[in-house]
Amino acid sequence: MSYYGTVINDSAIIVVKAGEEIPAPAFLAVGADGKVATAGKNAIGIVLPGCDDKVTAGDDLDVQIKDIGAWTAGAAVAYGDELAVGAGGKAVKATAKSFIVGIALEEATKAGQRIAVQIVKAGYKPAE
């Protein structure tokens, strides 16, 4: 007789190998290749704060892929804004044809602030 546990990994966190040197990866979005996500494109998730220091290619990154977390804003955003990846893997308000990675759960009044976000991966924002 066989006994099976859960075969679905319901963790919000995965480990991704860094695909490049990243000076301060914490709270930045990364792609599946372990590199800082490209503006407007899909991101696998957001690097957690255990990775505050510089990482080199091949190092482990703890990446949050769902639920509520923190993301560094690349510009001012409002509570409830759909968020996409901006320059340097930071959160910006999603525009047409950019991939919606999350929803802002608090506002950022300037670039560099860390804000709470709901990671949703809602697909590409349609043109209005």
Give names to the regions the model predicted.
Residues 1-128:
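Surface-exposed, low-hydrophobicity beta-strand/loop segments enriched in small/polar/acidic residues
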